[in-house]
Amino acid sequence: MRTLEVSVVTPGGPVLEESFEMVVCKAETGEIGILPGHIPLVSPLQISAVRLKKGNDTKYLAISGGFMEVQPEKVTILAQSAETASDINVQRAKEAKDRAERRLQAKKDNIDKTRAELALKRAINRLDVGK
């Protein structure tokens, strides 16, 4: 079966460079599946899991937004952060989730609600991928 070269890069450097048969990401317009030969496109990505399929194996990455560039035989994901399931510290993600929930429940005026909501989404995404 044909494959795509997939590169996932963060400001800290490359996270993954490998070949896969299919890439599934959550773009701003909804979930998108990429197969070899896909038309070129650039799309912003949401905080979500990226599914990378090769044969019967599926690898998951937790990404915190970014962009995806698609060429017929290559997918490049430029993300603010990206972690493989094995790299996620589940305990730390649970603590981040609890902290964000407490901030959102607090009735203080000085809370940046948008920032707390994004932190909660990132923590939930990391927990989902890390399990």
UniProtKB/Swiss-Prot annotation:
It is found in: Cell membrane. GO terms for cellular component: plasma membrane; proton-transporting ATP synthase complex. Its main location: membrane. It comes from the Bacteria. Signal peptide: none annotated. InterPro entries: ATP_F1_dsu/esu_C_sf (IPR036794), ATP_synth_F1_dsu/esu (IPR001469), ATP_synth_F1_dsu/esu_N (IPR020546), ATP_synth_F1_esu_C (IPR020547), ATPsynth_dsu/esu_N (IPR036771). Keywords: ATP synthesis, Cell membrane, CF(1), Hydrogen ion transport, Ion transport, Membrane, Transport. GO terms for molecular function: ATP binding; proton-transporting ATP synthase activity, rotational mechanism. It is a peripheral membrane protein. Gene3D superfamilies: ATP synthase delta/epsilon subunit, C-terminal domain, F0F1 ATP synthase delta/epsilon subunit, N-terminal. Produces ATP from ADP in the presence of a proton gradient across the membrane. NCBIfam families: ATP_synt_epsi (TIGR01216), PRK00571.1-3 (NF001846), PRK13446.1 (NF009980). HAMAP family: ATP_synth_epsil_bac. Belongs to the ATPase epsilon chain family. F-type ATPases have 2 components, CF(1) - the catalytic core - and CF(0) - the membrane proton channel. CF(1) has five subunits: alpha(3), beta(3), gamma(1), delta(1), epsilon(1). CF(0) has three main subunits: a, b and c. This is ATP synthase epsilon chain. The lineage of its organism: Bacteria, Bacillati, Bacillota, Bacilli, Bacillales.
